[in-house]
Amino acid sequence: MSEFAPICIYLVISLLVSLIPLGVPFPFSSNTSTYPEKLSAYECGFDPFGDARSRFDIRFYLVSILFIILDPEVTFFFPWAVPLNKIDPFGSWSMMAFLLILTIGFLYEWKRGASDRE
Amino acid sequence: MIIDTTTTKVQAINSFSRLEFLKEVYETIWMLFPILILVLGITIGVLVIVWLEREISASIQQRIGPEYAGPLGILQALADGTKLLFKENLLPSRGDTYLFSIGPSIAVISILLGYLIIPFGSRLVLADLSIGVFLWIAVSSIAPIGLLMSGYGSNNKYSFLGGLRAAAQSISYEIPLTLCVLSISLLSNSSSTVDIVEAQSKYGFWGWNLWRQPIGFIVFIISSLAECERLPFDLPEAEEELVAGYQTEYSGIKFGLFYVASYLNLLISSLFVTVLYLGGWNLSIPYIFISEFFEINKIDGVFGTTIGIFITLAKTFLFLFIPITTRWTLPRLRMDQLLNLGWKFLLPISLGNLLLTTSSQLFSL
């Protein structure tokens, strides 16, 4: 427990370090006294049209789905990698089977074109 | 470092009073001290990187660079930061105020947390966790959420696209990076950063993980460049396409916080290259004065600690020349090229590297 105490304290301090600068310019912020064009979205000098939160490319979504599949699987490798010299061959080879399944899934996704951007 | 001094002081206190909670309070307060020193050091490190980048950029482009603020323009970054602190704080009228304000802070916090586990000397680490590098990987993947929040909160088309691009790029390159770190912890049989450095301490620089993991080293550099959004991969803030990406609507210190976050990220990836691949605080000269130099690393006093910090920082800042010079030599990739490089080149290569490392570890048992 004590080895995680520095993390908590450091978390509080880094919160302070990044939140205090946000508070400093408040005396100088003058949202009320400026003209409305200054606060509108920047679109190269034209009046902004439409809403920015419209449709976006589905491929960004695909990338995040692929990430969600692959990242936890990679995360599972860490508890196996550290004591590799202490576990028996069964343990190491069962992780190889896991890696094989991961690779097959990745190849399938590749052949289906989920990571194509055209 | 913390433990030694604390135990003696705590014994002294216990002789005065036997209250247990007083001891805990004292330990907590004593723990603040190294943390504050670390934060101060990080800030100075960021200022030095900004200065280095401006000077190197200037000399690559045959300019002079900053020269008026302080000797050789060292104080230029400090002057810029102070100016940004007193700038007007604009909040876009149609945007989401909370997401807009919190976004840069989240990016900074998540990157700052990674510095916990960097060993600067043989016992000079804030938290020597057994899950060390894993903490960095877990915490550093919070940063794209901050960028996404700021892109969404600005309600600007450029910002929105920039935020999406930043998130997609960070998560694409997260996996090759993790696989490279995984290969390192396979080699060292530990995820603790201190153990990883000590596994490289034999045979001088021939013991570096760089020689045992050349593929992993290159993949790590490329992925960490992409994680830092440095120039071959700076698509989220591509000036010619999206005005400044997710930073378009920002002004004042929030804009500055994004820059602090990006330089902090650059510094921490360089520190991790030093720790994981370049032997950390070890002097790394194999043949000359071998016994004397190895004894230096074992000295516990101020001298050994200072030398450890100096060696770590020297390796880090020498390595930093690579990302700074790539900024002025390589052209920017297209978005589909970027994602293809991540998913179809780096990921299979790092998987193969992991397989190679595993089999070499298994057969050498």
Curated annotation (Swiss-Prot), chain B:
GO terms for molecular function: NADH dehydrogenase activity; oxidoreductase activity, acting on NAD(P)H, quinone or similar compound as acceptor; quinone binding. One of its GO terms (biological process) is photosynthesis, light reaction. The chain crosses the membrane at residues 32-52, 98-118, 129-149, 257-279, 302-322, 338-358. Pfam families: NADHdh. The gene is ndhA. It catalyses: a plastoquinone + NADH + (n+1) H(+)(in) = a plastoquinol + NAD(+) + n H(+)(out); a plastoquinone + NADPH + (n+1) H(+)(in) = a plastoquinol + NADP(+) + n H(+)(out). One of its GO terms (cellular component) is chloroplast thylakoid membrane. It is found in: Plastid, Chloroplast thylakoid membrane. Its EC number is 7.1.1.-. Disulfide bonds: none annotated. NDH is composed of at least 16 different subunits, 5 of which are encoded in the nucleus. It comes from the Eukaryota. NDH shuttles electrons from NAD(P)H:plastoquinone, via FMN and iron-sulfur (Fe-S) centers, to quinones in the photosynthetic chain and possibly in a chloroplast respiratory chain. The immediate electron acceptor for the enzyme in this species is believed to be plastoquinone. Couples the redox reaction to proton translocation, and thus conserves the redox energy in a proton gradient. Belongs to the complex I subunit 1 family. This is NAD(P)H-quinone oxidoreductase subunit 1, chloroplastic. It is an enzyme of class 7 (translocase). Keywords: Chloroplast, Membrane, NAD, NADP, Plastid, Plastoquinone, Quinone, Thylakoid, Translocase, Transmembrane, Transmembrane helix.
